[in-house]
Design a protein with these regions (language model features):
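Conserved catalytic core of the tyrosine transesterase superfamily
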Residues: 1-148
């Protein structure tokens, strides 16, 4: 593999300006895929075919990986093979027709009226900080903003 994955991670950082979390996740996903391919007799992940990638996706699903994990792995491989194309390491992108599984979006949990009342009653509105905190809580509640 001659440092190809490591060079890809450097490319993500330096050129794509990705987050550290993306870089760590993609590196882990690609190394896991490389280990799978090695077990299948493919020494270099760069030599993977479309059929190999589909086989790997089925393996992840059989092993009960979450759809979000499989989806991220697809994203990692697609970005990796696009990088290899850009670097002229491969002539055809085997991930071109790779599609991630559908990831169900979770319905956000909402607070009851009683919980909202309790939350809004917490700041001590007799102080400046309490008034500020109450105003922030009211703003968050009124706009429906959420933590992502």
């Amino acid at each position: 593999m001659d440092g190809t994955i490591e060079n890809f991670v450097i490319y993500l950082h330096d050129v794509k300006k990705t987050s550290k979390n993306t870089e760590v996740s993609y590196e882990r996903d690609l190394k896991k895929a490389a280990a799978y391919f090695k077990d299948q007799g493919i020494e270099d992940i760069c030599e993977s075919s479309e059929a190999n990638l589909n086989s790997y996706m089925l393996y992840l699903e059989r092993e009960k990986f979450a759809p979000s994990t499989v989806s991220r792995s697809v994203a990692a491989m697609r970005t990796f093979f696009q990088y290899l194309m850009k670097e002229k390491r491969i002539v055809q992108d085997p991930s071109e027709h790779l599609h991630p599984p559908k990831v169900e979006k979770k319905v956000p949990e909402i607070l009851t009226v009683e919980e909202v009342d309790l939350l809004l009653s917490q700041p001590d509105t007799r102080t400046a900080k309490g008034l500020r905190d109450r105003a922030m809580l009211e703003l968050l509640y009124a706009t429906g903003i959420r933590v992502s």
